[in-house]
Amino acid sequence: MKVLHVCSELYPLLKTGGLADVLGALPAAQKEIGLDARILIPAYPAISAGIPDTGVVAEFHNSAAGHVVLRYGEFNGVGVYLIDAPNLYAREGNPYHDQWYNDYADNYKRFALLGWVGAELATGLDPWWMAEVVHAHDWHAGLTSAYLAYKGRPAKSVFTIHNLAYQGLFAYHHLFEIGLPTSMFNVNGLEFYGQISYLKAGLYYSDAVTAVSPTYAREITTPEFAYGFEGLLSTLHSQGKLVGILNGVDDNIWNPNTDGYIQDHYKLKSMTGKKKNKAALQAHFNLPEKPDALLFVMITRLTEQKGVDLLIQSAENIIKQGGQLALLGSGAPSLESALLGLAHKHPKNIAVKIGYDEPLSHLMVAGGDVILVPSRFEPCGLTQLYGLKYGTLPLVRQTGGLADTVVDSTAENIKERRATGFVFNEANSQALSHAISRAFSLWKKQRTWFTVRTVAMEQDFSWQISARRYEELYRRI
């Protein structure tokens, strides 16, 4: 089965979030189980630099982009089509906005071309390979399904929601420029409150829609999580067209026994390396090297969605019980300054690095005792999965993929060898603080802690499992 993934990020070449991690791993896992999976992505500078050896598949003229060349190369064993359109894509840095965080004014053209080429690869743009399933990811690729529908559905279409908060909204008058008829601009189509929504195109015109966890798939049928799409998503859910499939963990990148970013490897039967990573992490952050101090880590975008404000309000509980907190991330200036203020006030307990640092993130997952993911909503979440794999117990809010992947350390769950971390329900600082206290209580019972840690490390969230679930879906539609 020939599967084309249409996307705008690819780990490790270009990443702004978890979307890149998925595309860096899922197509390769699908190839391993026998699917012929390929990727379509704009030829951003970082992508072109990472895939330098390409051949020309097709050339054409586009009114928005001018001369366009469709190239083909390979990356990590997976075939990749690159849309070489310098007028639209030859921009360094973030693929969606400029250095001042202003969205590019021509994003409607940039991502319409991505969707159009995705549909054309199902109808012969590459005469040697024709997609049977076109799998689009997030709003950037949402128009793919609309173009396929306009062409009479020459291939099956699947659309994955990684984050419903970003909807790809553009003015109605751009409809003519993107080559779609006015008949598609209505409630049963592209229209969303008077604008074109590329996200809605993906939701409405696809044969199946997936969310990146079963719980998130249910949550987005409710007004609290649906951003105005609850009617459409509820309909899709009742028709069996909306399903949740968990993301996986790329074992080539995230594995404590082979991790290329850490010096001291370890595995379930030999955990000495974890203690060494903890000491190295404490040294890196200039925290006192205390093996007995409970060390919390958090790697995140600094936004209220991620519950960072809840942590700021609860940090006192970590300090008062003699714990330590190491945090890596960037985002809202108010949250950055509040965290830096805490670190300045409590240098023996709290350390903060503003920015993103891939090697450091691996050391933090390897060296921490608890990884914090107190999100208000979380479609899937990846850091809690890394924590499980590295024996760094996740402390999470019961939402989205966090609810599907972490089992709370209640007495009953511990006894049944099911517990893998700490879970709290309400999105407030009191609930988070109580969960932090429960982590300290368990830390005092080291034998029980080791039992929970063992169960956590035994969990299997490999991409092969996810790849098989997607294959089942492709064959069903």
UniProtKB/Swiss-Prot annotation:
CDD domains the UniProt entry points to: GT5_Glycogen_synthase_DULL1-like
Pathway(s): Glycan biosynthesis; glycogen biosynthesis
Record keyword Transferase present: yes
GO CC annotations on file: cytosol
GO biological process: glycogen biosynthetic process
EC assignment: 2.4.1.21
Binding site for ADP-alpha-D-glucose: 15
Pfam family, one: Glycos_transf_1
Taxonomy, superkingdom: Bacteria
Catalytic reactions on record: [(1->4)-alpha-D-glucosyl](n) + ADP-alpha-D-glucose = [(1->4)-alpha-D-glucosyl](n+1) + ADP + H(+)
Keyword field: Glycogen biosynthesis, Glycosyltransferase, Transferase
UniProt KW Transferase keyword: yes
One Gene Ontology molecular-function label: alpha-1,4-glucan glucosyltransferase (UDP-glucose donor) activity
Assigned protein family: Belongs to the glycosyltransferase 1 family. Bacterial/plant glycogen synthase subfamily.
Function, in words: Synthesizes alpha-1,4-glucan chains using ADP-glucose.
NCBIfam families documented for this protein: glgA (TIGR02095), PRK00654.1-2 (NF001899)
PANTHER family found in the cross-reference section: ALPHA AMYLASE DOMAIN-CONTAINING PROTEIN, GRANULE-BOUND STARCH SYNTHASE 1, CHLOROPLASTIC/AMYLOPLASTIC
Annotated protein name in UniProt: Glycogen synthase
Gene: glgA
